[in-house]
């Protein structure tokens, strides 16, 4: 892979028209998410640096929210937000940074620790993708790339500095970052640092969300050596540190202690309470309502998350159609530390991942191949503090290892003068997980195929079939001890984890069809019109959920004294996606719609954590060509009444209106300056996203200034 300063700089030059900042790029091509450097590769969705600067999002999930059927899960704390893709999230969506997996996952806490200032672009693959990335890719893949010096240098400069200051009113967020970079014909180097500081978040109608303040700081260093035309090496190291004081369950609105739970229980059972006769909920409704509105017991804690990654890349790209080779060696380490504010009880979870990826592509006259081998080793260690008061009932600490080896093959077979393109792929994974006392091992084959039919020069049809799997995580395999518990006058009520030796991997079989219409010079010379429609059906077997088990010797909700990770057979996720865009030299109009429904095929019951349907419309207009652009987006989120029977909460509809403006001249006296302004939730709506335990951000004015020299 020969890197040209000119070509790489051009692809990331700040596009001042900003016409595509909020629109979905339907024909993005990149090798990061698809692992495919061939000319036939296709990345369905992409967010460029220009789009990220315009949005000024504070999390990866928020940056992707305008994509149909991609939503934010995890509440309003940015550190806990994760992308929900077609109803699946958390460890069912693979996260990739600079071509290597990020495997840290801890229930109700964050796993996306890369700050937006260090992201050059984001790619999204929607739908099962295990044939590319192995275990976990049931919902899709989110792949991020950090910048290098060649991204930031302009006009064949050899040295540069970029300074950015951002501010947001909803939480007084201050974002500072500085990058210094240089390059010549052989070497390129980049050093970046950032510091973010935020107060408590303001939600709709002026209310504050307690314990949402945070600090995050860190940096990135990259070095590249273009040895010759055929050989290049890169070395990068990234470190970030995140600090906050929040409930141990980062998705919960407030701290919820055992004492508070007991108080609510006593109030409910008190015969002298003032419930109107028809207003008092049933016993089951009461307990399910507590869980759905407040979450579980969660104590206020000081939290720190050091995260680091080191990656070595080697590229071999001789003038040989059989060789286009990439080798990556990497080491990731993430530590999640918590200390309870009142009792001082300490917890720690540490995950280290070491791995190697080897990939090669071969271009033959009538067929193209991409093939490779991945190996990674995860090592997790946990510490769980206890005492006789608030930490009496705790999960047991565990240490475990996991080894995964995967081999994959992707082929592209053009037929009938490339009118048809057949792209089959397959991946075989072997994995084992072990603790001191237990060992599991298994393997899985993940096939996929894609057929693209170019009917005319303005109409394409695509049909996909993808299979995916997710092996049980080490937490699902090895967690033991108490899930939660409390002491009462009649004794201890303890909910304990029960191991499940028969826990099976989740598997997914996805069917998908897409129609893509694209016209040039439709109404006037130089305009472009695109419309894309997709229907998918993802059948997920053995979906793993934590299930509370009844005690056969007792009655009522209080008898739920065990929790066990179990497989739910025959879950079905289906939905549609529509997106359209019309673009002229100055004007861009766009709309998109996404809807996902999920149910258990056996019981017919709705699945949890399925985002509400949404439709968005917007426009961008260059008031001053190549200099100043304004835009607006209106998004309607439908009511979500499809919830599990024991969820006890439904969610009303709401509409959000966002405005934006960008000043970024390509030439002239101020060509090195870029200003972005955004006003989100213009009318300060009070709203709560489906399945979130807290309300969303209120009116938020954002401003960002970037200066390069």
Curated annotation (Swiss-Prot):
Q: Could you tell me which CDD domains the record lists for this protein? A: ligand_gated_channel (cd01347)
Query: What's a single GO MF annotation on this record?
Result: siderophore uptake transmembrane transporter activity
What's a Pfam family this protein contains?
A: Plug
- Location(s) in or outside the cell: Cell outer membrane
Keyword Transport part of the UniProt annotation: yes
Q: What Gene3D superfamilies does the record point to?
A: TonB-dependent receptor, beta-barrel domain (2.40.170.20), TonB-dependent receptor, plug domain (2.170.130.10)
Give the UniProt entry's GO cellular component terms: cell outer membrane
Bilayer topology reads: Multi-pass membrane protein
Ranges where the TBDR plug domain occurs: 36-147
TBDR beta-barrel domain location, by residue? 158-709
Q: Where is this motif: TonB C-terminal box?
A: 692-709
UniProt keyword list: Cell outer membrane, Membrane, Signal, TonB box, Transmembrane, Transmembrane beta strand, Transport
Specify the superkingdom. Answer: Bacteria
Which segment of the chain is annotated as a signal peptide? 1-21
- Is this entry keyworded Signal? yes
SUPFAM superfamilies, sorted: Porins (SSF56935)
* Family in the record: Belongs to the TonB-dependent receptor family.
Provide the function of this protein.
Required for utilization of free heme at low concentrations.
Q: Which protein are we looking at? A: Heme/hemopexin utilization protein C
To which species is this protein native?
Answer: Haemophilus influenzae (strain 86-028NP)
Q: Which gene encodes it?
A: hxuC
């Amino acid at each position: 892979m020969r890197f040209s300063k000119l070509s790489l700089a051009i692809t990331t030059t700040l596009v001042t028209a900003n016409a595509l900042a909020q629109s979905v790029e339907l024909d993005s091509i990149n090798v990061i998410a698809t692992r495919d450097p061939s000319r036939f590769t296709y990345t369905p969705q992409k967010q460029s640096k220009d789009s990220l600067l315009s949005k000024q999002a504070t999390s990866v999930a928020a940056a992707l929210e305008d994509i149909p059927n991609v939503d934010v899960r995890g509440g309003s704390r940015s550190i806990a937000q994760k992308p929900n893709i077609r109803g699946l999230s958390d460890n069912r969506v693979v996260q990739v940074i600079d071509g290597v997996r990020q495997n840290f996952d801890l229930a109700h806490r964050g796993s996306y620790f890369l700050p937006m200032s260090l992201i050059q672009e984001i790619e999204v693959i929607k739908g099962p993708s295990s044939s590319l990335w192995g275990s976990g890719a049931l919902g899709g893949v989110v792949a991020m790339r950090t910048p290098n010096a060649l991204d930031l240098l302009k006009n064949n400069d050899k040295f540069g500095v970029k300074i950015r200051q951002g501010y947001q009113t909803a939480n007084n967020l201050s974002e500072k970052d500085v990058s210094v970079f240089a390059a010549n014909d052989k070497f390129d180097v980049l050093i970046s640092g950032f510091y973010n500081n935020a107060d408590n978040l303001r939600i709709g109608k002026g209310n504050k969300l307690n314990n949402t303040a945070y600090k995050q700081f860190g940096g990135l260093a990259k070095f590249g050596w273009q040895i010759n035309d055929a050989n290049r090496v890169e070395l990068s190291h990234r470190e970030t540190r995140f600090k906050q004081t929040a409930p141990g369950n980062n998705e919960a609105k407030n701290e919820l202690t055992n004492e508070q739970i007991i108080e609510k229980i006593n109030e409910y059972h008190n015969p002298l309470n003032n419930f109107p006769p028809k207003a008092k909920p049933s016993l089951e409704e009461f307990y399910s309502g507590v869980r759905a509105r407040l979450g579980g017991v969660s104590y206020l804690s000081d939290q720190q998350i050091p995260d680091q990654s080191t990656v070595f890349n080697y590229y071999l790209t001789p003038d040989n159609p059989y060789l286009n080779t990439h080798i990556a060696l990497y080491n990731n380490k993430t530590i999640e530390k918590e200390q309870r504010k009142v009792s001082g009880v300490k917890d720690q979870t540490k995950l280290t991942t070491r791995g190697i990826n080897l990939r090669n592509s071969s271009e033959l006259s009538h067929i193209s191949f991409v093939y490779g081998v991945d190996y990674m080793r995860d090592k997790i260690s946990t510490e769980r503090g206890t005492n006789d008061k608030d930490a009496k009932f705790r999960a047991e600490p565990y240490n475990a290892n996991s080894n995964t080896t995967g081999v994959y093959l992707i082929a592209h077979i053009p037929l009938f003068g490339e009118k048809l393109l057949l792209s089959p792929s397959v991946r075989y994974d072997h994995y084992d997980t072990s603790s001191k006392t237990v060992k599991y091992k298994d393997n899985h084959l993940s096939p996929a195929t894609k057929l693209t039919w170019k009917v005319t020069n303005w109409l394409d049809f695509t049909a996909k079939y993808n299979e995916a799997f997710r092996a049980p995580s080490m937490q699902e395999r090895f967690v033991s001890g108490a899930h939660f518990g409390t002491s009462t006058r009649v004794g201890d009520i303890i909910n304990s984890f029960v191991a499940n030796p028969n826990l099976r991997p989740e598997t997914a079989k996805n069917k998908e069809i897409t129609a893509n219409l694209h016209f040039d010079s439709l109404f006037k010379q130089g305009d472009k019109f695109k419309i894309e429609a997709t229907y998918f059906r993802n059948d997920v077997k053995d979906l793993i959920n934590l299930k509370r088990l009844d005690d056969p010797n007792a009655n009522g909700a209080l008898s739920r004294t065990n929790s066990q990770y179990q497989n739910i057979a025959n879950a079905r996720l289906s939905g549609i996606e529509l997106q359209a865009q019309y673009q002229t030299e100055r004007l861009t109009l766009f709309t998109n719609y996404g809807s996902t429904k999920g149910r258990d095929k056996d019981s017919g019951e709705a699945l949890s954590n399925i985002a509400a349907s949404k439709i968005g419309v917007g426009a961008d207009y260059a008031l001053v060509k190549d200099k100043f652009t304004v835009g607006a987006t209106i998004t309607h989120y439908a009511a979500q009444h499809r919830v599990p029977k024991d969820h006890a909460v439904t969610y009303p509809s709401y509409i959000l209106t966002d405005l934006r403006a960008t000043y970024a001249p390509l030439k002239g006296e101020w060509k090195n300056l870029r200003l972005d302004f955004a006003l989100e939730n213009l009318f300060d709506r009070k709203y709560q996203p489906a399945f979130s335990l807290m309300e969303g951000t209120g009116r938020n004015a954002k401003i960002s200034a970037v200066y390069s020299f």
